[in-house]
């Protein structure tokens, strides 16, 4: 983490180890400790930590004094350096962060403070105090620990150099916390802050810095017993507010959020920062919610005596009160230095709790009450040198705050004696302990009243236990925990709580919450105005008017709150479907939240801890892998998980672990139970809404994402054994990191009902999110419902002719966000089945000239295909609105923008589709062969001239089972749909705007870059099929037939996708088993060519022992038979096995059958010789091979089922079991049928 090392010297009292009387300098005078004596203890902190982040554990080591020496840099330099046994410089900790005083003095050595628990005898050492700020008011002679406000901040502003010092310290803390200390981002941000401070004397915190600082300030609050909840603080950034009415609106929203129908949530609202001390924003109330106090002429006080002065001030402002015992004071705020305004709260906003006792019925007759949410509003938030003078911080009550202090203190309600008399206690004799007895019963009443109404409160015993856990955690994580014993110890039953017996060190860290002078004392009233004269005229309203106003005001609060709560949607996709759903979700959320969308690869993981609402739409690639643009996010979450559990791994190890299939499998299981692999409890919304008192401070609810509410929609195909594995992994690990699950993860199956599942999930999660953040879902849901059914029309989409356009490769690159490369075909594709009979399928070898393209054997190439000309031409004939399909056109969308002058509309280019001809768009960019979605069918129904066509299309669109049966039976492309409904004539512009992207197709590279430089070879099976049980029209696989029809010198557009998990092992001493039937042999051709090149060109290099298992239908279609025989002759392939599944007079045999026959040898190759297994083929074959190898190894090694499963996962983790798996194809009808049946059962079972 750090490039310096902090030395902490701990004095140990031994015979000769006395403290030196010379304590000014290190050297002849050794800063308090004589290191020439027999022994001292040195703790090295910073340089020896792992992970590069804050909150690291200290690595301790003990050094003998003989191993230390003092080094003077020069005869003219009185600054000395303490050297370790290996000559390393042991820098001394400088609590000021200035690196010395510039006058030759070294920074102070931090002496650990030993703190003991008197009861348990446990000891801890606090070195965190070395980072304390110098605001202690105690002197060498006098302790000021019991002073109520030892340090009060006035209206003076800081000097720019002091601001910079604080800013540097804060930024160091912030970037350490996200493990980016000294990174380019850190350096850039520090330079930006320096320039801003030099120019203006101040600077502005980013939103994430503000959120981090607010949480850290709570964590640093030495007087707070409930700090274990610090990471769950909700921060409302209201620095944009400029008026008192805006402040009132924000405070009301805060109260609504924090109250949460009694399940209280901690939150802070932060208004604009101090500038010059003359334009401060202030909240004049000490607490946002409090009861008024009125002093009568006879000296008697009605209400709360603590608020008499402020109540009188409010009355002078013009506030009209009822002068009862329980009047809620108005909110008094001032903005930008102006005079204050007061505001009455809507009555329904404040939750109050009538007090009663479980045994004493008369207690309720006392008509006592208290409010639910405590909200401190008089303190200054000091963060990074910036002072925020107006903040409101809310949590929940510890019962003694109400029962002991508010109700029983002599200067408050002073109810102790009246209640004791009601209890029949003798109040004349203190030895009767009447005060103690009454105090206990009052606190019982408070707890009973709150708990019986499911309103969050915590008793002092639970709070004390939670603080001890926090104290222990902080000592481990930060080497100390500032704690003010006088404030931490509860006001009753003190000695029976553990905190009473715990020694504590009180010191102050920044960021912090500080006491500040009351606005009543510091405010400068505007000329000609006086607080006593500043009275506001009030209108009288009848009941109906008040009711309407309250309802309207509540709606305003809800809308304002929605603008402040950010919702982030993340997606990971291979085909674009997840992105499509994510964008629909963002549009839906935008009706109630400040919604943003990111691809996982573009998301800054350091922001995730500060998210309020996180929704994830994630697809699974292959048999459980994350999509390429989700891999880094998966690794980042895994790193966060390891960091949280105290484990640390090298980045390379982390990458392998986080991207291995076993990693995804192990973390995607839905049967992990209540506890995940970390032992961390998964929190969902049902848990969070229980309102349990003890759960509020339960340590099990914490984690780095404990303030994040999340939900996941996972996309996948049930044809794969690891269905939706990546989405399940994201859902599980977010929960394990402490996130609050809004609702159970939903899945969308590509085989059946995916769109239906999403359309069901999206409104549900939207409604729950609104409820969670106290927004009105009824008001917004009706508007938001249109987001999922938004219809483009001829009024909002149009085609416009343009002159400028981009080349095809540039357009493809932008459209797919991939670097498209233009290559050419070396020669016409070669048919690899020269001897096949007419009924066999064909496989071709495609040779591409790819100059300057780097790849490794095992990598994939993505081909951008083209749709068939006859389909494109047929669709164009049925479209309207475009006269010339070969004219360059730009698709434009009518956008609405909210401005100060109202709604502004303008035509803007489509965010995705390029400028090109309609023919090119349908040929190269849009998917016209996949059966249309139900949403598209709904649109097509609106374009029909015939009522029967319209009704039939609407039935398909609205009835899920009818649609699925039609889709499965016909598998129609768009031309066939338009032919089936001939009256459908859609406008071209609206039609193309509805279509999905034509996705690239991936193929394993079949050539070695060393043997065929500047070439890429592909082994491609030509796909053709007929729907309707073989009786329908012939359909053609888009890409395979596109490749088959290429001719020499034709242009082709592609990109290479690295597949590191399928690369050849660098350790060529280990044997290799290759298993791949049919075109699964494709990557193995690149392997044997590579080994052949190594053996031929690099004489001294060895190649591994290689066994190849290949399967096909008949001998006539044995792919690359001659090449394989040649490789056997060259000694590249040691053994080649051929499985034939349809050869006459030979039993049907598959590759796994041959593997079983060689069980003993395979077991030895894997278990004893530590060999590698490579499997390439469709998902069904891959699963059969996996189970076969599992069976072989279990039988030979006599292992249990559990042991074998663990070993197979270990093979993956060691990167010795490699898979390159195809999706299901239409020719595997039985698999498709089974998967579809499973998907329909899953859909039917969902509520």
Swiss-Prot record:
Keywords annotated in UniProt: Calmodulin-binding, FAD, Flavoprotein, FMN, Heme, Iron, Metal-binding, NADP, Oxidoreductase
Q: Where is this region: Disordered?
A: 13-33
Question: What residues bind heme b, as annotated?
Answer: 224, 515
Q: Which cofactor does it need?
A: heme b; FAD; FMN
* Activity modulation notes: Stimulated by calcium/calmodulin.
* Gene3D superfamilies (UniProt xref): 3.40.50.360, NADPH-cytochrome p450 Reductase, Chain A, domain 3, Nitric Oxide Synthase, Chain A, domain 1, Nitric Oxide Synthase, Chain A, domain 3, Nitric Oxide Synthase,Heme Domain,Chain A domain 2, Nucleotide-binding domain of ferredoxin-NADP reductase (FNR) module, Translation factors
Is Nuclease included in the keywords of this UniProt record? no
Give residues annotated as binding NADP(+): 1073-1091, 1170-1185
Q: Does the keyword Flavoprotein apply?
A: yes
Q: Which InterPro entries match?
A: CysJ-like_FAD-binding, FAD-bd_FR_type, Flavdoxin-like, Flavodoxin/NO_synth, Flavoprot_Pyr_Nucl_cyt_Rdtase, Flavoprotein-like_sf, FNR_nucleotide-bd, NADPH_Cyt_P450_Rdtase_alpha
Residues covered by the Flavodoxin-like domain: 567-766
For the ligand (L-arginine), the binding residues are: 287, 396-397, 401, 406
User: Which parts of the sequence bind (6R)-L-erythro-5,6,7,8-tetrahydrobiopterin?
Assistant: 146, 487, 500
> Which stretches does the entry tag as region Calmodulin-binding?
537-557
- Name the residues that bind FAD: 855-866, 998-1008
Question: A GO molecular-function term, please?
Answer: nitric-oxide synthase activity
Task: List ligand-binding residues for FMN.
Answer: 712-743
**Biological process according to GO:** nitric oxide biosynthetic process
Co-factor binding details: Binds 1 FAD. Binds 1 FMN.
The recorded induction information for this protein reads: Detected in the midgut and carcass soon after invasion of the midgut by plasmodium. Early induction is also primed by bacterial growth in the blood meal.
The UniProt record lists the FAD-binding FR-type domain at: 795-1065
Instruction: Please report the name of this protein according to its UniProt entry.
Output: Nitric oxide synthase
What species is given as this protein's source?
Answer: Anopheles stephensi (Indo-Pakistan malaria mosquito)
């Amino acid at each position: 983490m750090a490039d310096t090392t902090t030395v902490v010297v701990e004095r140990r009292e031994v015979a000769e180890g006395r403290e030196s009387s010379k304590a000014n300098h290190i050297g002849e005078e050794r800063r308090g400790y004589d290191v020439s004596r027999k022994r001292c203890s040195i703790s090295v902190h910073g340089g020896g930590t792992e992970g590069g982040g804050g909150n690291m554990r200290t690595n301790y080591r003990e050094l003998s004094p003989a191993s230390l020496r003092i080094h003077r840099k020069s005869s003219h330099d009185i600054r000395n350096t303490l050297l370790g046994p290996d000559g390393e410089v042991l820098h001394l900790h400088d609590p000021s962060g200035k690196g010395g005083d510039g006058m030759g003095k070294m920074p102070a050595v931090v002496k650990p403070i030993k703190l003991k628990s008197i009861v348990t005898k446990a000891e801890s050492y606090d070195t965190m105090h070395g980072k304390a700020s110098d605001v202690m008011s105690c002197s060498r002679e006098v302790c000021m620990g019991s002073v109520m406000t030892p340090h009060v901040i006035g209206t003076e502003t800081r000097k720019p150099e002091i601001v910079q010092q604080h800013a540097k310290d804060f930024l160091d803390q912030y970037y350490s916390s996200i493990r980016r200390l000294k990174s380019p981002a850190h350096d850039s941000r520090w330079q930006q802050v320096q320039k801003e401070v030099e120019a203006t004397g101040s600077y502005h915190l980013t939103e994430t810095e503000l959120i981090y600082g607010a949480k850290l300030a709570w964590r640093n609050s030495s007087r707070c017993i409930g700090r274990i909840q610090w990471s769950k603080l909700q921060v409302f950034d209201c620095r944009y507010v400029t008026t008192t009415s805006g402040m009132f609106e924000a405070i009301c929203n805060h109260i609504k959020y924090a109250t949460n129908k009694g399940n209280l949530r901690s939150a802070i609202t932060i208004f604009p920062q101090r500038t010059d001390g003359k334009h401060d924003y202030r909240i004049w109330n000490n607490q946002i919610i409090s009861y008024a106090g009125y002093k009568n002429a006879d000296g008697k006080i009605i209400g709360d005596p603590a608020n008499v002065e402020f109540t009188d001030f409010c009355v002078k402002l013009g506030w009209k009160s009822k002068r009862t015992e329980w009047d809620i004071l108005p909110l008094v705020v001032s903005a930008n230095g102006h005079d204050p305004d007061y505001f009455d709260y809507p009555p329904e906003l404040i939750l109050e709790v009538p007090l009663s006792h479980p045994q004493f019925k008369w207690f309720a007759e006392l008509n006592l009450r208290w409010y639910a949410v405590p909200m401190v509003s008089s303190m200054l938030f000091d963060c990074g040198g910036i002072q925020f003078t107006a903040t409101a911080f809310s949590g929940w009550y510890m019962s003694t705050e109400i029962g002991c202090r508010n109700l029983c203190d002599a200067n408050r309600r002073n109810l102790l004696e009246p209640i004791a008399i009601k209890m029949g206690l003798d109040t004349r004799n203190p030895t009767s302990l009447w005060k103690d007895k009454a105090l206990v019963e009052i606190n019982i009443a408070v707890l009973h009243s709150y708990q019986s109404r499911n309103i969050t409160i915590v008793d002092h015993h639970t709070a004390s236990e939670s603080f001890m856990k926090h104290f222990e955690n902080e000592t481990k994580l930060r080497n100390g925990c500032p704690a003010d014993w006088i404030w931490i110890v509860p006001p009753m039953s003190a000695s029976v709580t553990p905190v009473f017996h715990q020694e504590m060190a009180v010191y102050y860290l920044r960021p912090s919450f500080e006491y500040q002078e009351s606005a009543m004392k510091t405010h400068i009233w505007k000329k000609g105005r006086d607080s006593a004269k500043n009275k506001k005229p009030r209108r009288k309203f009848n009941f109906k008017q008040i009711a309407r106003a309250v309802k309207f005001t509540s709606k305003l609060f809800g809308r304002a709150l929605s603008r402040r709560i950010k919702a982030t949607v993340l997606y990971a996709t291979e085909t674009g479907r997840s992105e499509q759903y994510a964008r629909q979700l963002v549009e839906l959320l935008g009706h109630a939240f400040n919604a943003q969308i990111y691809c996982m690869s573009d998301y800054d993981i350091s922001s995730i801890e500060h998210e309020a609402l996180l929704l994830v739409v994630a697809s699974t690639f292959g048999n459980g892998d994350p999509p390429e643009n989700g891999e880094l996010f998966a690794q980042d979450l895994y790193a966060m998980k390891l960091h949280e559990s105290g484990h640390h791994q090298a980045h390379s190890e982390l990458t392998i672990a986080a991207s291995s299939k076993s990693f995804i499998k192990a973390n995607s299981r839905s049967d992990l139970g209540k506890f995940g692999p970390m032992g961390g409890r998964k929190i969902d919304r049902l848990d969070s809404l229980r309102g349990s008192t003890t759960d509020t401070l339960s340590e099990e609810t914490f984690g780095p994402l404990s303030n994040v509410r999340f939900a996941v929609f996972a996309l996948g195909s049930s044809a794969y054994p690891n269905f939706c594995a990546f989405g399940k992994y994201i859902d599980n690990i977010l929960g394990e990191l402490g996130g609050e699950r809004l609702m159970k993860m939903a899945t969308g199956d590509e085989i059946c009902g995916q769109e239906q599942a999403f359309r069901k999930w999206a409104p549900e999660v939207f409604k729950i999110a609104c409820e969670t953040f106290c927004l009105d879902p009824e008001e917004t849901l009706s508007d938001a419902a249109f987001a999922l059914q938004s219809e483009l029309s001829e009024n909002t989409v149009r085609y416009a002719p343009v002159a400028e356009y981009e080349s095809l490769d540039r357009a493809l690159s932008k459209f797919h966000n991939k670097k498209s490369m233009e290559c050419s075909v070396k020669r016409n594709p070669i048919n690899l089945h020269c001897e096949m009979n007419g009924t066999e399928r064909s496989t071709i070898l495609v040779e591409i000239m790819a100059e300057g393209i780097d790849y490794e054997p095992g990598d994939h190439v993505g081909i951008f295909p083209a749709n068939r000309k006859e389909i494109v031409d047929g669709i164009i004939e049925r479209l309207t609105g475009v006269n010339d399909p070969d004219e360059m056109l730009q698709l434009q969308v009518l956008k609405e923008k909210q401005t100060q002058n109202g709604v502004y509309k303008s035509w803007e280019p489509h965010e995705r589709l390029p400028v090109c001809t309609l023919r090119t768009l349908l040929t190269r960019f849009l998917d016209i062969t996949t059966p249309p979605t139900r949403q598209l069918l709904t649109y097509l129904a609106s374009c029909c001239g015939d009522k029967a066509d319209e009704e039939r299309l609407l039935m398909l669109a609205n009835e899920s089972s009818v649609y699925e049966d039609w889709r499965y039976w016909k598998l129609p492309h768009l031309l066939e749909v338009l032919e089936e409904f001939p009256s459908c004539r859609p406008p071209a512009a609206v039609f193309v705007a509805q279509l999905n992207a034509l996705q690239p197709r991936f193929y394993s590279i079949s050539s070695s870059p060393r043997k065929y430089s500047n070439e890429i070879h592909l082994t491609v099976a030509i796909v053709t099929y007929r729907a309707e049980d073989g009786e329908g029209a012939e359909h053609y696989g888009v890409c395979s037939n596109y490749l088959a029809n290429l001719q020499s010198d034709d242009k082709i557009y592609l990109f290479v996708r690295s597949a590191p998990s399928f690369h050849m092992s660098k350790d060529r001493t280990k044997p290799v088993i290759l298993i791949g039937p049919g075109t699964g042999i494709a990557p193995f051709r690149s392997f044997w060519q590579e080994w052949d090149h190594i053996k031929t060109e690099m004489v001294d290099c060895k190649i591994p022992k290689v066994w190849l298992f290949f399967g096909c239908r008949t001998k006539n279609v044995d792919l690359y038979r001659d090449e394989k025989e040649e490789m056997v002759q060259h000694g590249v392939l040691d053994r080649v096995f051929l499985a034939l599944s349809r050869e006459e007079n030979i039993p049907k045999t598959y590759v796994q059958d041959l593997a079983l026959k060689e069980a003993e040898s395979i077991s030895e190759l894997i278990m004893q010789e530590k060999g590698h297994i490579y499997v390439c083929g469709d998902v069904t074959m891959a699963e059969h091979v996996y189970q076969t190898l599992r069976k072989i190894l279990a039988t030979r090694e006599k292992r249990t089922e559990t042991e074998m499963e663990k070993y197979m996962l270990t093979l993956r983790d060691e990167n010795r079991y490699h898979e390159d798996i195809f999706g299901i194809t239409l020719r595997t009808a039985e698999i498709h049928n089974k998967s579809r049946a499973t998907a329909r059962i899953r859909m039917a079972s969902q509520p």
